[in-house]
Amino acid sequence: MEDFRVRHECSSLRGTLLDSRYAKAVQCLVEEVIDIGGREVELCNNILINQLFPGRRRPGFALSSEIKSELCSSGFMSLPENHEIHIKITKLLSLLQQVEERFEQYCNQLEQVISSFEEIAGEGSSKVYTGLALQAMTRHFGSLEEAIISQLNSVRRRFIISHQDVPKIISSGLSQLSLFDGNTTSSSLQRLGLVQGPQRHAWKPIRGLPETSVAILRAWLFQHFLHPYPNEAEKLVLASQTGLSKNQVSNWFINARVRLWKPMIEEMYREEFGDSLDESMQREANDDSN
């Protein structure tokens, strides 16, 4: 009985606040005094989702079924010698479907929380709090999707190396997958390896890595300056973003740590500690020589 009375009083108070003619004016006044970027968060969130998933409100919206349909229609899944790869692709598609379902579940739960919150605080009042959370989770789930797509492409590449007559896969479902940098669909698919780019003449050697690929790797290095070497999953994502192989990515970071990262660290220490560092290094050198 006491619990019912408390709920009734809360409901009455909520109704009184929402019906008050001063509620809107107070809300506007509070927004002017305490502006934490609600409109900017909403705009940024909408732009982010449109860039990540053009034409789709959420990541993974039936993407696994689209990929499976394209693989089947291309004849890739029906090749008789393709049994082991078929099993791997099936597992990856199942994992991708789970990511889709989990994100759909997250969005539904978030919508329920938003609805409950806005019943009390007013329509649109939750955007400030949920916008950044939705951005973060969209990026997380999008990264998982991208890693799974990269694995699918890796399996396909290995099979194509041993079976050169395999039909090429051009997926309309995959064409909707963006790589967080706002580039065109064509360049995104080329980085994933799902569409062949311009063919390079066999007699023309490659002098170093492409500048665009190096720029992506260098940006990652500076973003993770304290831990400048990617793990296995991060290598796969970087490989898909740059169009390089996993070994090329690994070798670049090994060289970059020696040629770029280590000299920068030493320079930073010199600027911070000055002559004391040089003296310490000189003593260590003398100790080693002795």
From Swiss-Prot:
<dbReference type="InterPro" id="IPR006563">
    <property type="entry name" value="POX_dom"/>
</dbReference>
<dbReference type="Pfam" id="PF07526">
    <property type="entry name" value="POX"/>
</dbReference>
<comment type="subunit">
    <text>May form heterodimeric complexes with TALE/KNOX proteins.</text>
</comment>
<keyword id="KW-0238">DNA-binding</keyword>
<comment type="similarity">
    <text>Belongs to the TALE/BELL homeobox family.</text>
</comment>
<keyword id="KW-0539">Nucleus</keyword>
<dbReference type="InterPro" id="IPR008422">
    <property type="entry name" value="KN_HD"/>
</dbReference>
<keyword id="KW-0805">Transcription regulation</keyword>
<keyword id="KW-0804">Transcription</keyword>
<dbReference type="InterPro" id="IPR001356">
    <property type="entry name" value="HD"/>
</dbReference>
<dbReference type="InterPro" id="IPR009057">
    <property type="entry name" value="Homeodomain-like_sf"/>
</dbReference>
<dbReference type="GO" id="GO:0003700">
    <property type="term" value="F:DNA-binding transcription factor activity"/>
</dbReference>
<dbReference type="Pfam" id="PF05920">
    <property type="entry name" value="Homeobox_KN"/>
</dbReference>
<dbReference type="InterPro" id="IPR050224">
    <property type="entry name" value="TALE_homeobox"/>
</dbReference>
<protein>
    <recommendedName>
        <fullName>BEL1-like homeodomain protein 11</fullName>
    </recommendedName>
</protein>
<dbReference type="GO" id="GO:0005634">
    <property type="term" value="C:nucleus"/>
</dbReference>
<feature type="DNA-binding region" description="Homeobox">
    <location>
        <begin position="202"/>
        <end position="264"/>
    </location>
</feature>
<dbReference type="GO" id="GO:0003677">
    <property type="term" value="F:DNA binding"/>
</dbReference>
<feature type="region of interest" description="BELL domain">
    <location>
        <begin position="81"/>
        <end position="152"/>
    </location>
</feature>
<keyword id="KW-0371">Homeobox</keyword>
<feature type="region of interest" description="SR/KY domain">
    <location>
        <begin position="20"/>
        <end position="36"/>
    </location>
</feature>
